Amino acid sequence: MTSQAFPKKALAGVRILELGPYVALPMTGRILAAMGAEVIKVETNKVLDEMNFIPAWSRGGGQPEFQRAKKRITIDVRTPDGLEVFKELVKVSDVFMTNFRRNILDRWGIDFPELRRLRPDIILMWQTGLGGIGPYYTYKSYGILVQHMGGVSLMSGEEGEPPATINTSYSDYHTGVFQPVAIMGVLMRRRLTGQPASMESSIFKSGAVTAGPALLDYQSTGRMPERIGNRDPNAAPHGVYRCKGDDRWCAVAVQTGDQWAGFRQAIGDPDWCSEDAFASLESRLANQDRLDELVGAWTAGQTAEDVMTRLQESGVPASLVSQGKDLYEGPHLKAREFYRTTPFYLADRSKPAWEWEGMEGISSANPPKLSESPMDYGHYSNIGEDNDYVFKEILGMSDVEVQRLHENQSLF
């Protein structure tokens, strides 16, 4: 079979039903949609995802980032008519994924046994904060809480200070990357065996895997992790150093003898570099306070870009600490085609023209670049914009029926 016989997109022909808010689940759908799957995002105007409230209305940063390339529809599954429409969609979908609690799904009448009855070979994915079993499974969880429970924050922060929060939902993003891999795996299994599958995923576990070294250290030695700020037990100098400019910094890591020689060359090999206190990694680790002061005195007179360039040219790992401007205007991500200009299409022209016409948003690409089936980033549509396509073309509903269910707020 020639390559032309395969679909252009890696997941073309796969239909996925997504029901749930926040970051991890929409991130999963975003990745699968970019790879060609038809991801139908089920929402309702009655209870909006918090991402809609990041300014501006319905165009907040979270929306173009997580909802692009999806088919966005409105169904209130809590209504009898809405529930029936949702069940019809289940019958024509390959995957159903959600992050609602099971007791909520049970109350709505879309528990997993019922979904499997509607489509016996459907793949079911349930994502929670802490998982579906275990002593904490009923606990409420949210971003920062799961981050701390996962253990990474215990290692973050300065010596003698409280654990430091990483100010982004990194566990959600990890989960959003792990879940597409699992879904593609069970899709392949179903193709090979014809058998369906269910999976359960937790944000807690996705965060805990990044604390692996601390877990292994405790298991083998009984040691607890220590907070050491930006330092590293196997490198010196190792830290983030202030540079010329407003809140400009550069990260530097010197691990090997060759890197230390390159570092000395890059900074002009001042006399202090020849002191016995800095002759070996062990001695540099023992004298880090003074070493950091000396390195910081050198970086303070240079731009972060110059520090990075000079050290890298001498074989020393170094990087500026990027601000938003660096990420957006920097040459490397542009060369990687990381940013996408995403147009805003709006079917509902009841909004004032000045609010919508000509609007575009910038969103990030998925990190992998596929050579033969490039990612499809589509456009950013408004909530409910794809109602006609899904209800009329996929489900074959009439204009009259769609209008009736919209008026009684089942499709709202």
Residue ranges, per PLM feature:
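N-terminal helix-loop segment corresponding to the beta1-alpha1 unit
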Residues: 1-195, 227, 353-355, 382, ...
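Oxidoreductase and adenylate-handling cofactor-binding alpha/beta cores
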Residues: 176-197, 209, 213-221, 264-271
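An anion-binding loop in the catalytic cleft
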Residues: 243-248, 304, 361-412
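Aromatic-enriched alpha-helical interface/lid elements that frame and gate functional surfaces
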Residues: 237-314, 318
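Short Gly/Pro-enriched turn/cap motifs at secondary-structure boundaries
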Residues: 63, 225-233, 240, 252, ...
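A glycine-rich dinucleotide-binding beta-alpha-beta segment and adjacent secondary-structure elements
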Residues: 314-374
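Glycine-rich beta-alpha junction loops
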Residues: 46, 129-131, 203-208, 245, ...
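A short glycine-threonine-serine/GTX helix/turn-capping micro-motif
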Residues: 163-174, 196-198, 228-229, 236-238, ...
